[in-house]
């Protein structure tokens, strides 16, 4: 079964909009686990405009499921990950001012750098995942870095799903199959939601994990957090 990792960045965004500690990011993470999430994801950025580095340190002793820290591997991020030692680190090629992730790595141009990072994190017992698109040559190179997994950037799938879901999913199935053949675990994330998640998961039954934040928090405004997590898990069990 595919694990649901809840990205709690948007919870931190709401907190930071007003100051103070409401909602309490640490409690929300614990409640997500209580309600059935199999993981918690955070994406700290250098300006700490949502998740703060202090949040990450605070979350570490509380998380009882899998803890995934994703982000651009600047020196500050690398130091954070090595100190916290999460279950998984997901390497994302974000510019510091990016509103959200908008592409996967060009592994060819960053091969030596990514290989070095993978070796550094692996030596500390941290599972590694590289954020990529569906380019097959890119995935083959990702496997050669020694990474444990890739995370497929699913925004193109979500964009074209309403027009032609079979056409939208096709490159992702091909990419995920190649990754599986190369011995890589496959994660996915970005713009997955209650409308498109079940079809994605059905077509890639070996999917290990989806990381979902923005859509899930939006749905929770209507359904409540507990019911929303149940709805997303139902998509992954269908």
Curated annotation (Swiss-Prot):
Catalysed reaction equations from the record: 3-amino-2-oxopropyl phosphate + 1-deoxy-D-xylulose 5-phosphate = pyridoxine 5'-phosphate + phosphate + 2 H2O + H(+)
Protein residues bound to 1-deoxy-D-xylulose 5-phosphate: 45, 50, 100
Family annotation (Pfam families): PdxJ
Main location: cytoplasm
SUPFAM superfamilies per the UniProt record, alphabetical: Pyridoxine 5'-phosphate synthase (SSF63892)
Pathway assigned in UniProt: Cofactor biosynthesis; pyridoxine 5'-phosphate biosynthesis; pyridoxine 5'-phosphate from D-erythrose 4-phosphate: step 5/5
Keyword Transcription appears in the UniProt entry: no
Site (Transition state stabilizer): 151
Location of the active site: 43, 70, 190
Swiss-Prot/TrEMBL GO biological process terms: pyridoxine biosynthetic process
List of residues binding 3-amino-2-oxopropyl phosphate: 7, 18, 191, 213-214
InterPro entries found in the cross-reference section: Aldolase_TIM, PyrdxlP_synth_PdxJ, Pyridoxine-5'_phos_synth
Keyword list, A-Z: Cytoplasm, Pyridoxine biosynthesis, Transferase
EC top class named in words: transferase
The EC number(s) this enzyme carries: 2.6.99.2
Gene Ontology MF, one: pyridoxine 5'-phosphate synthase activity
A GO cellular-component term linked to this record: cytosol
Location in the cell: Cytoplasm
Family: Belongs to the PNP synthase family.
Stated role: Catalyzes the complicated ring closure reaction between the two acyclic compounds 1-deoxy-D-xylulose-5-phosphate (DXP) and 3-amino-2-oxopropyl phosphate (1-amino-acetone-3-phosphate or AAP) to form pyridoxine 5'-phosphate (PNP) and inorganic phosphate.
NCBIfam families: pdxJ, PRK05265.1-3, PRK05265.1-4
Subunit structure: Homooctamer; tetramer of dimers.
Protein name listed in UniProt: Pyridoxine 5'-phosphate synthase
Protein source organism: Parabacteroides distasonis (strain ATCC 8503 / DSM 20701 / CIP 104284 / JCM 5825 / NCTC 11152)
């Amino acid at each position: 079964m595919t694990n649901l990792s809840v990205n709690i960045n948007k919870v931190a965004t709401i907190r930071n909009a007003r100051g103070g500690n409401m909602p309490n990011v640490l409690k929300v993470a614990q409640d997500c686990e209580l309600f059935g999430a199999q993981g918690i994801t955070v994406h700290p950025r250098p300006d700490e405009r949502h998740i703060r580095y202090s949040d990450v340190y605070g979350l570490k002793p509380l998380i009882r499921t899998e803890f995934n820290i994703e982000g651009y591997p600047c020196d500050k991020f690398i130091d954070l990950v090595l100190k916290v030692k999460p279950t998984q680190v997901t390497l994302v090629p974000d510019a510091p001012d990016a509103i959200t992730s908008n592409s996967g790595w060009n592994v060819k141009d960053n091969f030596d750098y990514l290989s070095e990072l993978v070796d550094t994190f692996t030596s500390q017992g941290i599972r590694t995942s590289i954020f990529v698109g569906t380019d097959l040559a890119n995935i083959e190179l990702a496997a050669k870095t020694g990474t444990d997994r890739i995370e497929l950037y699913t925004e193109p799938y979500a964009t074209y799903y309403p027009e032609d879901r079979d056409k939208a999913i096709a490159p992702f199935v091909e990419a995920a199959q190649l990754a599986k053949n190369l011995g890589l675990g496959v994660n996915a994330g970005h713009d997955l939601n209650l409308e498109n998640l079940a079809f994605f998961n059905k077509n890639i039954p070996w999917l290990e994990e989806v990381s979902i934040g923005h859509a899930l928090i939006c749905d929770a405004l209507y359904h409540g957090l507990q019911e929303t997590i149940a709805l997303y898990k139902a998509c992954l069990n269908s």
